[in-house]
Amino acid sequence: MIEWIIRRSVANRFLVLMGALFLSIWGTWTIINTPVDALPDLSDVQVIIKTSYPGQAPQIVENQVTYPLTTTMLSVPGAKTVRGFSQFGDSYVYVIFEDGTDPYWARSRVLEYLNQVQGKLPAGVSAELGPDATGVGWIYEYALVDRSGKHDLADLRSLQDWFLKYELKTIPDVAEVASVGGVVKEYQVVIDPQRLAQYGISLAEVKSALDASNQEAGGSSIELAEAEYMVRASGYLQTLDDFNHIVLKASENGVPVYLRDVAKVQVGPEMRRGIAELNGEGEVAGGVVILRSGKNAREVIAAVKDKLETLKSSLPEGVEIVTTYDRSQLIDRAIDNLSGKLLEEFIVVAVVCALFLWHVRSALVAIISLPLGLCIAFIVMHFQGLNANIMSLGGIAIAVGAMVDAAIVMIENAHKRLEEWQHQHPDATLDNKTRWQVITDASVEVGPALFISLLIITLSFIPIFTLEGQEGRLFGPLAFTKTYAMAGAALLAIVVIPILMGYWIRGKIPPESSNPLNRFLIRVYHPLLLKVLHWPKTTLLVAALSVLTVLWPXNKVGGEFLPQINEGDLLYMPSTLPGISAAEAASMLQKTDKLIMSVPEVARVFGKTGKAETATDSAPLEMVETTIQLKPQDQWRPGMTMDKIIEELDNTVRLPGLANLWVPPIRNRIDMLSTGIKSPIGIKVSGTVLADIDTMAEQIEEVARTVPGVASALAERLEGGRYINVEINREKAARYGMTVADVQLFVTSAVGGAMVGETVEGIARYPINLRYPQSWRDSPQALRQLPILTPMKQQITLADVADVKVSTGPSMLKTENARPTSWIYIDARDRDMVSVVHDLQKAIAEKVQLKPGTSVAFSGQFELLERANHKLKLMVPMTLMIIFVLLYLAFRRVGEALLIISSVPFALVGGIWLLWWMGFHLSVATGTGFIALAGVAAEFGVVMLMYLRHAIEAEPSLNNPQTFSEQKLDEALYHGAVLRVRPKAMTVAVIIAGLLPILWGTGAGSEVMSRIAAPMIGGMITAPLLSLFIIPAAYKLMWLHRHRVRK
């Protein structure tokens, strides 16, 4: 089959070259137009349900809103995890779906089940779906700053809410623009309880009057002078004077009682659950641009920047927009870095080819397969919808060396056969027809084995395709693009390369002996191989012992899920205890931001505590998320690295009650979505009794702090909230003609503040709040004395119908699959994650006694690593079996297939030793490198064995038991090994040379790519060295055994 394809391609070379030209043009177009991003979208398919229940405590929100929603969503088809968050005034439910679920199908199913549960929610409470965005949709953030002092926080927030937000939402593929920080303007109707009692007016009557005085109505239309006039009765509240003139009732003598008689109307700030701060200089308002799921981040960011630039002229004087996070910077750095590495690889591979072949046109034949293979890979990427990112380009990068292997072997074999033809016909001139015939025969001779070897490299990535969840989404693009590139190289090797050889390998072909590099290789290899063939069993014993040397470094190498990717920015997410006030949170935020700005490498600090106005942010007030923009690396102090910056920040920011955590922004948001945990290691304690969960979480926190490598550990306190409980006495309330609902309505309105509508001021809408003065509700004693007007117009106090007590309770409730859960956040440093977790598990098992009904589960990146390891343990052996079958089909002998498979362990030797030497941990990235190494090592074995077989087949006496001799066998093995050392050395050299730029790279994304390249380079140093000696030695023993059997 392969022979037929080669011969038909050469026969129809014009059509093949036209097809190659078409592919190159099409591929160039796709390369230019392929969307780019920094990383693949690693987030799970999620649908967020946000429900506002203003003024309600977390326990009430959990009981009345979150619990009905989470229990219903557990039945949604395809849902694998349902997380609930109940906090003050808001409920968030995250429905996480299985991989491969269509996001819009998921939204429709959630909406369907949401309609079923809507009737179980409290009156007036309505759940809504969050934006169709992923967990990493926060692509651009900005702050509004007024350095002139002309505009306060309320003005800045209004500018964001009613101008910038709507302008930016018009940009295609922007799912949402969330406001954060600043102050929302609010009309506050502050009731004087004494004046209210004096006039005998209840709170309910005030609410009714406010509602009735803030409406507009239409009166149809009338005709005047042959024209239509629409009738409108204006009634919106627009000024404080409008509020003051609201009539509440008329006295007995007909004098109206106005709102101003019983209340003070003022403009003030709405209760805040989110605060933003810039550079430690003070509070600001800001916005977050959220990308629609699956769209092009860089294009959208560019459109956002252009839009903001055009809007600058429309901003009030003194107001400026400051960019506080811009993912396009990371995208550009990552793509530029990987593109540069690919170019370096191309150049290095070209130099290696030229040095070995010692013929420029022959080297060009091998080199041209690289851009053609790249075009094929990008064309398939385009149809699959893959974008260009660190991982997809990385797949091509690790394939570059192997892509030219087949071309190299074919070219070298063509050189050899042309040299032999000249030797056999010293007086003849090689005409065009004969040259094409020699080159075609040379291609057919090695083509099938090379095609099988490239197929083996392609199939070696099957385990990567089977990875699930986040690890599958991260390494899937790498596996796809490497597969496409290798498949393209295999196709080119049997279709295009023979044709290019026929056109370009012309004129005087320098003999192999004229190349000093080749002479050096033969001079070194020759005596060593003679010794190996003289003592084949000793050679195999030494090789087996060399494999055992990996036991020492393997025990020293730690484990992790993925290395920390340097995104160029940092996220400061300290863990704090709950119950902090808004004023204290703002003060703490400014202090930490100011300390962070003191580090010279920091360019800008955008601090956020609490949440932005979006369903994608469920942060409670005590959760700090500070985005740190760093200066370009060339502006850092000499010797500074990201690790050193984090260490200096950690030593600088030291405030009581804060457990520091420094994480990359994208990585953190991915982890929080997939596992719910913001730290690399997390422990989830689940149960039914909140007190038991709290006790266990605190015990685990104490134990965790004693484990080596744990930098910080903090358990959430479920019972850390402070409550003032109003316990209604039903009997006493009944004596005054009041129900429990009447008292609750009074507490909600007078203490919590009732939202009684909003003003309409152009396109702006501002809330109206009704409540008692601060002095009447600032202590339990003041609450007890709150006056109540009963339905029978009696004046009583709250203490007459209820007991007011101070207690503790949950500040925020979290559930996973409807079970209450507490999370312990653990940050590990100076030690690998796997070792820390193993010690943690041991310490918890020994020192923490589980209470009945509770359970402990490790989460975070460790959970993802365990899942990936489990999958690879199943799939790697299966893949080796598939490779073995392919080898058997190629050589038709079990022994020869086993011989090549046995070379794979020798590749591990160099890979593990290089990992240890470079200080890398075992991870999914290094595992990917080892899997790629297995395919390349098998390919080298195929090439080696192919030449040995050809040499033996060229000596007919070896197949005859009567003429067989060990001396002739050694001579054949010598010819197959030493005289064909050039293509083997080239195969190794181009792979190592192609990977070195990746290993030594330091730019964005190099943390992952270097760990993929390290085991491949280490393995390609030891595997070929051992295989150059082991395969001839083992093959000799195999033939000697075969000869004894024949005799």
From Swiss-Prot:
Principal subcellular localisation of the protein: membrane
Q: Which residues cross the membrane?
A: 14-34, 338-358, 363-383, 390-410, 446-466, 485-505, 532-552, 871-891, 898-918, 928-948, 985-1005, 1012-1032
Q: For this chain's UniProt record, which GO biological process terms are given?
A: copper ion transport
Subcellular location(s): the record lists: Cell inner membrane
What GO cellular-component annotations does this UniProt entry give? plasma membrane
Pfam families in the record: ACR_tran
What UniProt keywords apply to this chain's record, in alphabetical order? Cell inner membrane, Cell membrane, Copper, Copper transport, Ion transport, Membrane, Transmembrane, Transmembrane helix, Transport
> What is its membrane topology?
Multi-pass membrane protein
User: Signal peptide: which range, if any?
Assistant: none
Any one GO molecular function term = monoatomic cation transmembrane transporter activity
Induction comment: Transcriptionally regulated by CusR in response to copper and silver ions.
Q: Which InterPro entries match?
A: AcrB_DN_DC_subdom, Acrflvin-R, CusA-like
Q: What does this protein do?
A: Part of a cation efflux system that mediates resistance to copper and silver.
NCBIfam families given in the database record? 2A0601
Q: Which family does it belong to?
A: Belongs to the resistance-nodulation-cell division (RND) (TC 2.A.6) family.
Listed name of the protein: Cation efflux system protein CusA
Naturally occurring in which organism (per UniProt): Escherichia coli O6:H1 (strain CFT073 / ATCC 700928 / UPEC)
Q: Upper taxonomic classification of the species? A: Bacteria, Pseudomonadati, Pseudomonadota, Gammaproteobacteria, Enterobacterales
Q: Which gene encodes it?
A: cusA
